Amino acid sequence: MAKIKITWVKSTIGYKFDQAATIKALGFKKLNQSVIQDDSSAIRGMILKVRHLVVLEEVI
């Protein structure tokens, strides 16, 4: 399965609680942290919800 690298680049302060919960569900603990996740439809849906807070890269 393909992998994607997600980097959290913008704080959740001032945004809705569910967006902060989505950031935590993706596995982030600190700002500017990167995580590698499987490229699945569930992960893609979470990324769409917080697309203004993260940067996405494909891992080969």
Curated annotation (Swiss-Prot):
Pfam families found in the cross-reference section: Ribosomal_L30
Keywords from the named record: Ribonucleoprotein, Ribosomal protein
Origin superkingdom: Bacteria
Disulfide feature: none
InterPro entries: Ribo_uL30_ferredoxin-like_sf, Ribosomal_uL30_bac-type, Ribosomal_uL30_ferredoxin-like
Molecular function (Gene Ontology), one example: structural constituent of ribosome
Gene Ontology BP terms: translation
GO cellular component, one term: cytosolic large ribosomal subunit
Family stated for the protein in its record: Belongs to the universal ribosomal protein uL30 family.
Summary of subunit composition and partner proteins: Part of the 50S ribosomal subunit.
The protein's name: Large ribosomal subunit protein uL30
UniProt source species: Dehalococcoides mccartyi (strain ATCC BAA-2100 / JCM 16839 / KCTC 5957 / BAV1)
